[in-house]
Amino acid sequence: MARFFRRRKFCRFTAEGVKEIDYKDLDTLKGYITETGKIVPSRITGTKARYQRQLATAIKRARYLALLPYTDGHDH
């Protein structure tokens, strides 16, 4: 039986020594939302709980300021 080794998940923010996640850093935030606009959970990304909370707040602020979409385009 073949064994599959999953890559070890690690927190990018801890590795880079980030203190605060900025809502204006759209390139980083876009990596943590799905194509439908949902926030990707930390069990998938490997982000630590502290940074996941900051990430969620930053994404919500960016959405409120229309920097990020709430959902996808819905083009049928």
Curated annotation (Swiss-Prot):
InterPro entries per UniProt: Ribosomal_bS18, Ribosomal_bS18_CS, Ribosomal_bS18_sf
Recorded superkingdom: Bacteria
Gene Ontology cellular-component annotations: cytosolic small ribosomal subunit
Alphabetical keyword list: Ribonucleoprotein, Ribosomal protein, RNA-binding, rRNA-binding
Example of a GO MF term: small ribosomal subunit rRNA binding
GO biological process: translation
Pfam families: Ribosomal_S18
Entries under Gene3D superfamilies matching the protein: Ribosomal protein S18
Protein family per UniProt: Belongs to the bacterial ribosomal protein bS18 family.
NCBIfam families: S18
Function: Binds as a heterodimer with protein bS6 to the central domain of the 16S rRNA, where it helps stabilize the platform of the 30S subunit.
Complex formation: Part of the 30S ribosomal subunit. Forms a tight heterodimer with protein bS6.
Designated name of the protein: Small ribosomal subunit protein bS18
Taxonomy of the source species: Bacteria, Pseudomonadati, Pseudomonadota, Gammaproteobacteria, Pseudomonadales
The gene coding this protein: rpsR
